[in-house]
Amino acid sequence: DIPQDGQFPLPGQYSHACELIEDIKKMGDFCIGAACYPEGHVEMEHKKDDIRYLKEKVDCGVDFITTQMFFNNDIFYNFLYRIREQGIMIPVLPGIMPITTKKQLARSCALSGTAVPQRFRAIVDYFGDDPAAMKQAGIAYATDQIIDLIANGVRNIHVYSMNKPEVAAAIMQNLSEIVK
């Protein structure tokens, strides 16, 4: 979380992920995952710098990376191409967040800088004021994203369920004949 006064780093804390990764490596043989940002970190001015920092994390010993949420799979595929071009060959888990309320979308995108494609914006605009319909539409959109990822060879996917196990269960039910 962002410190209340906005000052980084706090005393006794890490200023870069590599510092944490290196300390964890010293503690034992752990599998270490890290975050990555297919649309670029919200505070990063240039995408190439973002990939350079990701490469540093990988070189420090990260075993896999999980992406920040995205709503357009082409962004993920392009990101995957760009990092592979830079020699980042570890597993990449796409992060899919089922948006179940209009408020959740606004808050999540404000924090992450994630772009909302027109197709999804139309869904939120149409169903956003009906909680049950928005929840079902958000689950359907996330399911469609996952189906596309699977069809394009992605085998491991992280679902940001946001402490809503029923949402994850609904997605798994939707995929029950696809993922066996």
Mark where each language-model region is.
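Short, acidic/polar
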Residues: 45-56, 138-148
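Conserved, mostly hydrophobic/aromatic
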Residues: 57, 61, 94, 157
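Active-site-adjacent beta->alpha loops and helix N-cap segments on the catalytic face
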Residues: 1-24, 44-48, 69-84, 164-174
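Short catalytic-loop micro-motif centered on adjacent basic/acidic residues
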Residues: 64-70, 156-159
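A structural motif
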Residues: 29, 62-63, 154
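Active-site pocket-lining/capping segments in soluble small-molecule metabolic enzymes
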Residues: 11-37, 81, 85-139, 144, ...
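Active-site beta-loop-alpha junctions enriched in small/polar residues
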Residues: 1, 35-41, 70-71, 95-99, ...
